Amino acid sequence: MLNRLIAAGLLLATPVLAQTGVLVVPAAEIAQKVNAAATSSTIATTDKYISLFSHRTVDGTPEQHANWTDVMVVQQGEVTLTTGGTISGNTVDAKGESHGGTLAGGTTVVVHAGDYLQIPAGVPHLMTKPKGDFHYFVTKVHI
């Protein structure tokens, strides 16, 4: 009976064991990318997501992503995040990504180390007033 249970368990686990696309990036490799990053460094990319480490010491410019949701975890520092409002004077590329210009209106919040942020596709956003070095991981999820 025990042998049958073990065999059944292995059969059920086979799809999990055979999964592809699993990625583990060792802490030492991430630390190397973090130390080398002037502004950002790509950790991993597929057609469904892009994972980056970003480093900011100056104000950003407004962004709005047509098809990407930003998921971020702040590692160090603090920054003022404005979301919503209206972007003007920006450029939009062929993929629907808006950069530059100015952001009017919106909601402002100060984010700190340890905070989790999720900015849905289509929402204008802007990071300003970084205090010292602002470090964060961002995964852009294609919707």
Spans of features found by a protein language model:
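Bacterial N-terminal signal peptides that target proteins for export
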Residues: 1-7
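A short, N-terminal "cap"/entry segment at the start of jelly-roll beta-barrel domains
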Residues: 2, 14-67
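His/acidic/aromatic-lined binding-pocket segments of jelly-roll/cupin-type domains
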Residues: 63, 70-73, 108-109, 116-117
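Short, conserved beta-strand element in jelly-roll/cupin
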Residues: 66-87, 93-104
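A generic "binding-loop/recognition-motif" signal
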Residues: 67-68, 123, 132
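Conserved metal-binding segment of the jelly-roll/cupin
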Residues: 110-129
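A short hydrophobic beta-strand segment most commonly corresponding to one strand
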Residues: 132-143
